[in-house]
């Protein structure tokens, strides 16, 4: 059933109908369309379009339809309705007859779809926050279990300074915490109800839009009808958050792939998140992490597509805006799947503590400690930096670590070096000295873990 047609003397060509119809993807808004319709029916009672009895009859029928949708949402796809709004109205008329035709009074599909997608996005934000928080909890638990796992920290993918695997985990806790808070901010901004804005100029019925907004779970009604039906900021914002969070997930996945490589051998991924080769029997591939990394471009592509769609649109609604749904549906589904998969990767992750420690002892990652040691002996830092650089070159030529050099060897470069140098060159000393807030010292990492556990409890 089309919601329009009186203006036309010819039926739409099937090719155009197939091109124009959106039910194949906007069926996902069925529950929200029904919820919005129930709210609108109550608003129509207050302006004497519906009687109380008629509203009760409509609400009962809509609730019955809601149960049917929840039991088998895919059944909607068997229909040839133009969109989800047409489908809901058609099914309502099947249940209550001509009374169902009164429900659209004062309402446009423009404000109808605007409220539907906002209701859907609000619900997805809640679900996404639950998934992100669950990932954070798993990272914190992994951190708690790996506080003694010393490993190299990297800059430019070169060994830089010793850290712990726990400190690495907690870095991602912070990244995902920002993603979580961005979702909260986005939720607050989208928590305004556009229903009652009509096609663009507002509704001709004196609907109490603030009451309607509260009935539908919004904080308040939107302030401008033209903006209300044109606004897709919340979709762009969620796509932006999803893209940034996917970038965080991709970095997590890339680290895991590197750590899992035969050259590093820092971690072993579970058989349950890896796959093999059809040719090479020995292979155990980190496919879960590679797919997270690969899907990141897909989500970012949805953001780019949406921005390009909106950038040239005049006010108010244009059919281009129908293109908002497939991108946001796919991007948020992909994001949530990747968050959940990253959580699964952590479930049975094994950290090779001996191997990480062995790697941390290589690469002269204690060179900064030697520079700080010279500073403590009165050498200006810029001079100590140069001295240590020369010392490292010497150690490389001799095939030694800094901690393996003798005092006479050290004193070729600085006379201030004494026997106390060896203590500060140990891995434990390297960690312990980084004791400012946010540092890698075991004490600070333990505090960060405890604080996060309390926050996420």
From Swiss-Prot:
Enzyme class: lyase
Localization of this protein: Cytoplasm
GO cellular component terms given for this protein: cytosol
UniProt-listed InterPro entries: Arg_succ_lyase_C, Argininosuccinate_lyase, Fumarase/histidase_N, Fumarate_lyase_CS, Fumarate_lyase_fam, Fumarate_lyase_N, L-Aspartase-like
GO biological process entries: arginine biosynthetic process via ornithine; L-arginine biosynthetic process
GO molecular function: argininosuccinate lyase activity
The reaction(s) this protein catalyses: 2-(N(omega)-L-arginino)succinate = fumarate + L-arginine
EC number: 4.3.2.1
Keywords (A to Z) from UniProt: Amino-acid biosynthesis, Arginine biosynthesis, Cytoplasm, Lyase
Pathway listed: Amino-acid biosynthesis; L-arginine biosynthesis; L-arginine from L-ornithine and carbamoyl phosphate: step 3/3
HAMAP family for the chain: Arg_succ_lyase
Similarity field: Belongs to the lyase 1 family. Argininosuccinate lyase subfamily.
NCBIfam families: argH (TIGR00838), PRK12308.1 (NF008964)
Protein name stated in the entry: Argininosuccinate lyase
Lineage of the species this protein comes from: Bacteria, Pseudomonadati, Pseudomonadota, Gammaproteobacteria, Pasteurellales
Gene this protein is translated from: argH
